Amino acid sequence: MSQISTKHRTVLFRRWMAIICCLIINIAYLVY
């Protein structure tokens, strides 16, 4: 159970990191 929860947590973390990176790139593109 713990391994599955940690794996799901890492997947969500990577997904959020990708979304945040996309937002930063879009903001930088709009600024520059």
UniProtKB/Swiss-Prot annotation:
Annotated gene: yscA
Q: What else is known?
A: Belongs to an operon involved in the translocation of Yop proteins across the bacterial membranes or in the specific control of this function.
Q: Which UniProt keywords apply?
A: Plasmid, Virulence
The record's section on Pfam families has: DUF5463
Q: Which domain of life is it from?
A: Bacteria
Q: Which organism is it from?
A: Yersinia pestis
This chain belongs to the protein called Yop proteins translocation protein A
Give the InterPro entries listed for this entry: DUF5463
